[in-house]
Amino acid sequence: MDYRSLGLKVGLEIHIQLNTKRKLFCHCPPVLRDDEPHFRIERRLHLSVSELGAVDPAVLWEVRKRRRYIYEGYRDTTCLVELDEEPPHLPDEEALATAVAVAKMFNAKIFDEIHVMRKIVIDGSNVSGFQRTMLIAYGGKKKILGYDIGVETIALEEDAARKIAEEGKTVVYRLDRLGIPLIEIATEPMSYPPQQVEEVAWIIGYSVKITGRAKRGLGTVRQDVNVSIAGGAKTEIKGVPDLSLIPKVIEYEVQRQLSLLKISEELRRRGVGKLELSTVDVTQVFTNTKSKIVKRVLETGGKVVAVKTPGFQKIFGVEVQPGRRFGTELADYVRAWTELGGLLHSDELPGYGITAEEVRDIISKLGVESFILLMGVDDRELEEAATVVVDRLNTALQGVPEETRGANPDGTTRFLRPRPGAARMYPETDIPPIRITFEILKKSEEIAKVSLEGKLSELTSLGLSKDLALQLIKSPYLEKFEDYVSKYKVPPQQIATILLNISRALAREGVEITDEKIASVLEALEKKIITKEAVEEVLRNMKAGESAEEVAKRLGLVRMSYEEVKKVVGEVVREVGKDRALGEVMRRYRGRIDVEDVRRALSELYF
């Protein structure tokens, strides 16, 4: 796919939890807990207009869901700030200094005075109904590993509560995560292809991680990806769980927008105009139905309603992403706006136990061949779902709607809510403006001393190639590598190869590789008991509690002394000549003999 000609623009929002001693706006410890909560409270959130009288569309959408929220907490690690019963404390200075340090790393312009803002969040994940956030810096630019990275903004904010369960209109959150400091780095739109966007995301994440101030573990880093193409619309994709999924998410979103543009073009070609809401109760058609889906609804006193969609024949079945069709998009909207489980559309019928005869009867009642079937027991839900479907189909005439979508594990996405507007942000009235003091700047300078470029330089100075150094930085073995280099007099390149290549290859074979085994091998290399060529076989055959030296003796892989090497080199030269001796010696004695010893012996004996 030629992304440049498609006008691809991608923006990243990288969210990273900071490893501080306290939460951002209170003094509770930032720890997640799995033990039984000490208390639960119930809240319902209500909409209020901003100071300018504006209402945010995303907030309005959430309010219409009429949900009930349960919050779980602990007496020793949850306080009244998290329960929105006490004003917030002043922000944690350690978190502020870290955010300023990251801003310096990307040459961003740091504000002299920080103002805390309230960002309306009414999905229940913030007890107060808003998230506290503060803009730290803007307009950063830096070239790293050949990538020109433009940073639009760097913000410091509180993380949301942790969702524990959801059933119907009730959502359960735990307050342990609420308030943990979170740094958000938002990039300028970039035109790099998907694989390179993944690399940029890694660079940004590692730049924070290398400070030692980032939390580690599952869920501590989250990526949002904004994608648009020429003629399409900006789509925000929330919660991409893993960096490796970013290229797929971008690729599939481009595919989706292209498909929606083709659908729009086809509808215009057909002369399809704005749809008016028109529904017909077709429950009687299914009096003797064999469809399990329909029977299940009818047995609970429900009904089947058909929505007329003239001109949409063969449109609902158009694939917009792998395994997802335009009809799936409509079903996502229905599930998001109502409690209904989805819908059926005319392009997939007959099917699901619905017969061709039943389809003909529906068409006869409607007077059109294209329709959507909705099933449920609540008339208001059915009416709302029908309205949602017609609104989305009318949007399809224009092309691609601006949406916030959620990432699925396979890289496809689903509709979450409309894109938020500017009305969701307003000043926090309980916290005064914060000056960036000399003390904060001094702390930030200490934190910013380390960098990705500095770490690369440090590793290449040890004799590692730039590619190998990058592999090591991206791997989980960097700290172990540095530890082993400080403990064993073994060439750093050999240590890196053992960690990155040999250990991984053996692990794929099902061989258990432990720190103790690697340490034993490095000790044997240092003492010249084994050669680097023997490492893989020794590790493969090492049993628990066995040393590398014991394994080498058992396998006959103990390294030859230099005197032995000279002896075998002389014998082989007499057999095959000097020119072929090196290769022949290594072939015969591989694993027991070091190539540098062979070269030295040849040089001393014959040159």
From Swiss-Prot:
GO molecular function, one term: ATP binding
Family matches, as SUPFAM superfamilies: GAD domain-like, GatB/YqeY motif, Glutamine synthetase/guanido kinase
Function recorded in the entry: Allows the formation of correctly charged Gln-tRNA(Gln) through the transamidation of misacylated Glu-tRNA(Gln) in organisms which lack glutaminyl-tRNA synthetase. The reaction takes place in the presence of glutamine and ATP through an activated gamma-phospho-Glu-tRNA(Gln). The GatDE system is specific for glutamate and does not act on aspartate.
GO cellular component: cytoplasm
Native organism taxonomy: Archaea, Thermoproteota, Thermoprotei, Thermoproteales, Thermoproteaceae
GO biological process: glutaminyl-tRNAGln biosynthesis via transamidation; translation
Pfam name, any one: GatB_N
Subunit structure, interactors included: Heterodimer of GatD and GatE.
Keyword annotations: ATP-binding, Ligase, Nucleotide-binding, Protein biosynthesis
Reactions that this protein is recorded to catalyse: L-glutamyl-tRNA(Gln) + L-glutamine + ATP + H2O = L-glutaminyl-tRNA(Gln) + L-glutamate + ADP + phosphate + H(+)
InterPro entries per the UniProt record, alphabetical: Asn/Gln-tRNA_amidoTrfase_suB/E, Asn/Gln-tRNA_Trfase_suB/E_cat, Asn/Gln_amidotransferase, Asn/Gln_tRNA_amidoTrase-B-like, GAD-like_sf, GAD_dom, GatB_C_1, GatE
Family the entry assigns: Belongs to the GatB/GatE family. GatE subfamily.
EC number from the UniProt entry: 6.3.5.-
The protein's name in its UniProt record: Glutamyl-tRNA(Gln) amidotransferase subunit E
UniProt keyword Transmembrane helix, yes or no: no
